Amino acid sequence: MTEAMARHAATIRLAVLILLAFGGAATGMAEGRRVQIITSFPPSFFEPFRSAFRDRHPDIAVEVVQRKTTAAVIDIRTHKRPDADLFWASAPDAFELLKRAGLLAPSKPRPTGAPQTIAGYPVNDPGGRYLGFAVSGYGLVYNPSYLTARGLPVPHNWADLAAPVHAGHIGLTSPSRSGTTHLMVEALLQSLGWERGWALWSAIGGNLATITARSFGVTAGVARGRFGIGISIDFLTEANAAGKEGNRFVLPGETLFAPASIARLAGSPNPEEAELFIDFVLSPEGQRMLREPRIGRLAVSPSAYGPQETPPHLSEIEGIFNRTGFDAGLSAGRYELVNLIFDEWITFRRAEHARLWRSLQAMEAALLSRPDEEAARLLTRARAALTRPPVSAAELDDPARFRNLARVPRGLPVPEEQARIEARIRSAIAASAAEAGDSLRQAAERLAALGWRDESQTGARP
């Protein structure tokens, strides 16, 4: 070997050693302590917690994956996030769904001083799989300026949203895209009963101006005057109202008031780090952070409130859960069925659904000054068709029938049994819409003979 060749070989050996050294260092960094969180909360909520936790534990990297609650549940159930450690969200039925699937690890309650229940609802899962850290009120958000400019009344309960005066002035998110909306839909179904609850949701659906892509879009739309009323959660209202003259929040009598929770996922690759993050969220410091204006949440720990501070909303909702008796287990068992019915009945048919409801409302009003027995019978028939759920309460007596329903991504095959259920639901909805439309046409003819002119669609918002 010549001297030049020897020098070249030595250079190569040195380069290899340097690469190995730096590669090893890089690998060591990549394999350092970390915790990955799946959450439905916005960055304005989780970033302060991530920063404060890193101050306490600078050796632990905190990775956050933001997903809508429903999408997060799908990701976790289909193991698309095998490296995730924690699930952090508002909707208790989403946690119950994951618990039933065996996807949540046990986690011991922390000494927060929180009561066992708030308004009758357990703060922590009695089975020890998820822990409440904050409290959420679910209700109505409205823009006072929008309502005043149009002479619209402020809604105070869910039934107000079905009033004809609010047609075209309401926004919400589909429950299949938002755990917040799903919880509110389910709460009314449980409070009023399956068939009465769906009748009310159908009427509210007929008044919708839009269905937004995310929960945050509802409060943002109200704040910007795209529509005047929304269905939302209290902290999203506060987040959008910051620095604005605008949104107000109402807790209806049949509302839902529930803990937001955090849980460690089964098979978490970083269980120690995950438990440390839970420790922090439930620590006095973490609980006090919830009360900061930039976050604006209700803490479960009484020590987070000042001596003269009364947690807002608590006096308004005392005993609500005792009346409604919300059952997270029942909700979890029919989670996808409720989403499927809402989307097929209201989301995907919004324009036609609104048109039918506007016609019905206009003719019911006309009937007051033009009494006609046959027209009244036809309108009663139309209302019954518009408010009839495509799955009856009697069919729910066999809960196993719908338990295996799952949200299937576009382009993937739907299981045969689910395809049959979906087809039957679509067929029932289409038949009811056709029945309502036929009855409304006949009623319109009778009222027209009495001098009535249908102007219900004139200038209507789509």
Please describe what each predicted stretch is:
Residues 31-96:
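Early extracytoplasmic/lumenal segment of secretory-pathway proteins
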Residues 47, 83-84, 90-212, 216-223:
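Extracytoplasmic ligand-binding site segments that recognize negatively charged/polar headgroups
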Residues 93-97, 223, 227-246:
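A ligand-binding cleft/hinge motif common to bilobed small-molecule-binding domains
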Residues 136, 169-173, 200-205, 211, 243-270, 280-301:
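Periplasmic-binding protein-like
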Residues 141-146, 257-273, 289-290:
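A bilobed periplasmic-binding-protein/Venus flytrap-type ligand-binding module shared by bacterial periplasmic
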Residues 363-462:
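C-terminal non-catalytic accessory extensions
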Residues 84-89, 211, 226-233, 248-250:
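Paired acidic/hydrophobic, glycine-rich loop segments that form the ligand-binding mouth/hinge
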